[in-house]
């Protein structure tokens, strides 16, 4: 409920102000009837972003098994490039299209509450990828990312809605 969330936020803020680091479990929450429930896949990321929003943190750092967001899955395409930054909206689109680094619900929270996220590796040093509302247009690539799922390749183009390659091929076949 709101009162529990508000009270928890106050406790977290006070602990941080006192230079204490609160250890908070993720992956669980309270449903509409007050029962504790699991949040499902990506629930820990969703928890982290929700807490960052509630305490008005300047950024939420997500440590994971990869060192950032790539232009496509580096396990499939070894030449994939790591992005220094990506917009929240673009990452939300990529997550919705099957990219597995960040879950859709976490990105929805980040977008709604304007929480910047830095995706970092748990295993090696590096700057990771910054996910923010806006990126300087000078740094913005035309193609941000490519997600692959169920034999479909989906592109995210700057300023253009997501279009799948299979859709483009089907349209091209219709014309011929």
Give the ranges of each region predicted by the language model.
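Single conserved hydrophobic/aromatic residue that forms the stacking wall/gate
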Residues: 1-8, 12, 167-170, 174-176
